[in-house]
Structures are given as C-alpha cells and as structure tokens.
Amino acid sequence: MCGMEYRLKKGSVYEGKVEKVDFPNKATVWVTDEDGQKEKAIVKNAIPGQTVRFCVNKKRKGHCEGRLMEVVEKSPLQTNPACPHFGKCGGCTYQTVAYKEQLKIKSTQVEKLLSEVVSGELPFEGIIGSPVTEEYRNKMEFSFGDEYKDGPLALGLHKRNSMYDIVPVTECKIIDEDYRKILTCVQNYAIEKELPFQHKLSHEGYLRHLLVRKSVKTGQILVDIVTTTQIEHDFTELVNRLTSIEYKGTLTGVLHTFNDSLADAVINEKTELLYGQDYIEEELLGLRFKITPFSFFQTNSLGAEVLYSKAREYVLSGGFGDVAGSKPVIYDLYTGTGTIAQMLSPVASKVIGVEIVAEAVEAAKKNAAQNGLTNCEFIADDVLKALDNIEIKPDFILLDPPRDGIHPKALEKIIDYGVDRMVYISCKPTSLARDLVTLQERGYKVEKCCCVDMFPGTVHVESVVLMQYCGK
C-alpha cells in the first residue's frame, strides 16, 4: 500500500475510480499501478462513481492524498449542473447529484462515523431532508477581490481551493433574487467609484466583505458593507441605489462595519447605521427572533424548523427522570440567539442559555422578552467559565456547540452534572464522534440519533443525538 511502499509518487498524476466518499468529502480512489497492485488515495471534492484524475500532494500512513485535477468520467449519480458557477465556486459540491442521492450520501457518512465510536448497535433513525433545496440561505458573506491576479474588482465567493481568487456568483442557486440584485448593485458601485479591495497578502485596500441577511418569513433584508479604515468614503449614494431597488422582500437596514483585523473573516470592530434598523426579524415555530448582523442563526430558516422540531422531540421523549411531574431546569449551552432555549421554555421551569458572543446574548434576551417568555436566562460567557458560576443545577442539558465541538475541560464539567439525559446537536459529525467517545466513557449511552440536511448541494449536514446516563 502507498503508506508502506510509496508506489504512488508525490507530484505524479494518476487516474482512478471513486469507490466511496467519507465525511468531510474525502473520496477513496483506487489506482492500479504498473505492477497490477491496487493502491488507495484520498481525494477531496469527488462524487461516488466518478473516474477522476488527481495529483498526489501528500503521503500518509496507509494512503496518499491527492488534489482533484479533472473528472474523466461522470458518476451515474450525476446530472448537469443547474448553476453556471458550478465547478469554479468553492461550494455546492453535490449540486449535480439528485437530492435523494445527496441524502443517501450524507446519511451513510454520518452513520459510518458514529457506528465506529458508539458502543453496540447504532440506533440511527436516518436523515431528514430540507423542505427547500434552492434559494434557502438567509445569510451570505460575499468577498471583494479579483477573479485572477491583478484583474478587475469582483464581488462573490472564493474560487475552489483558492484563498485569493473570487468568483462572481450573480446566478447562485442557493440565494434568491434579492441577494443577486444587491450583489450586482454593490459591485457596480464599487467599480464606478474605483474603490480598492483589500489585498490579503499586503493588507492594503478598502473593501473587504458584503454581508446580506434576509428573513424567509418576514422578507426583511439587512445589508452590511465591511471595509478597512484606510479610506474615508461616504456611502450615501450606494444607500440610495440600494433603497431604489424593487425587492421581493423589504430592505430594512444598511450598515457599514469597520474591520482592520488581519484575519480573513467578518469581524465587528465598529459598525455605523447608514439606513433603517440594524436587525431583521425571523419566525420559527411560532416564535419571533431579532437577528443582528453578527449573531449566530441557522442559515436555512425552514430547515431550522425541522432541526429544532427533531431536537425538541428528543428532549421531550422519555420524560425528565427524577423530575417527572414537575418542570425541569434546562441548560442550553452554546445557545446563540436563544432559539432552542425559547422553544423549550414552555416545558421547563427555567432555561439557562450560555453563549460567548455578547451581541447574540443581548439579542436572545430581547427575543425572549418579545415572545413573552419570563423563564429564560441568558449568560454572556465562555461555557467553560460560566459553568463554575451558575448556582442552579440542571435536570437536562442541550448542547449545540460550534464546528469544533466542545472543549475537553468543558465537556468534563458538563458530564459532572450527572443529568439523566442530554441532547447534542452537531454541525460537524467528526467533532460529535470525538465527544461521544468521552461521553460514553463517563457512563452515557446513545439512545437514538439522526441527521438533518440543512445545506442542500453542499457536503455539510447536522446531526442530533439523544443520550441517556447509564452509570459507569
């Protein structure tokens, strides 16, 4: 095998068929060498059944890793892409795969990952699809840059495998017409005014990102132009252009955020309100939520209703153990803007949400008040620190951490509460699998689990796990 004999040479190009694709989008490609021996390579961004050409760029124990160069033969699963940006843009790897097959791929990936770490037979309930497969995004972060080195200004998404080149995505299929109009308007304005974009290597330039949020239920739209402070510019004319566009929804706010950080991310160092209000409102499962530019909120609103309904079902299944007959105290850790906390409010005596982003916590408090909920408390702090200071103990814990999962020390503190049951929502199955190992070692058993597709066309998927404490 490659990891022992290194038959496949680094820098050389090979051709092979994709046998399977594991999360996160790692395809197993088998290559027959000149001696007739089969060797394995891992190649990203491929689809089961494709014949691909790739260049070996890394060697690992037991296999090589390669960079996809060309699809020599399509997979039987593939159709023609609906989006003209497919292949250039870095997203929507599975767009050419029928949605039913996408769900099979994702479900198989999650089931395989969890089966490898869960003790006994995996109680896997399969996957639930998104109610919509196109125009489902309620938030987009576009980047300013150029399509090629020293080219004209472009506004869009990063080209696949590139941190520098930008693909204009005016016909993107996961955003609706209003996003496309805003994207075109802002790009044309920037070109006309000859505003320079910030170069990622030199960190010189002005324009960095365009953030757009749009509510599915209310149709409210929020636009945020993110720049450095290297130039002073009056955006009044751009605001006038944006407000004169005929939208399906309603433009309720335009913001200008200043960000001089070196990181290639939208970071709020200072924000000015140029027009309207600095938030939009979305409705989920009968509750209304204010969403600010930088607060976390699931990017597929209709999919979020499916995800949270399943999480709530898991929370309510089996009662609340020792607190049966009375309402439990529920911890919602990594609560974001408090969406799940508020959905659990009717069945709890108290819900305590913890979130490190202060802006999100303020939004959560306002949302709870707006929804008439008096038993929700939200704390702005890191979970690891906050757990030392909360006096009231939980009867049930809900976990919805960021992609990298739960800090090991925080996970130990969570386990030490000894609650009868927990629900873990994860947007990265590999992180979930790692944390489940620790949870099982400390006495928890997976009662049931499933996944929910929130991101059609992409490689991403959400997972939900219900755990029961069974003792060490």
Tell me what each language-model feature is.
Residues 164-208, 229-255, 262:
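Internal alpha/beta scaffold segment
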Residues 70-81, 90-196, 217:
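Extended interfacial segments that mediate partner engagement and assembly in macromolecular machines
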Residues 212, 218-228, 288-292:
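Short, aliphatic-rich beta-strand segments
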Residues 27-33, 156-159, 224-226, 364:
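Short, acidic/hydrophobic/Gly-rich beta-strand patch recurrent on exposed beta strands
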Residues 1-81, 85, 377, 385:
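Terminal RNA-binding accessory module
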Residues 2-10, 15, 20-27, 230-472:
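Rossmann-like S-adenosyl-L-methionine
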Residues 49, 175, 300:
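Short, conserved phosphate/pyrophosphate- and ester-handling motifs at nucleotide-, phospho-/glycolipid
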Residues 125-133, 200, 209, 213, ...:
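Short, solvent-exposed loop/turn elements at beta->coil junctions and helix N-caps
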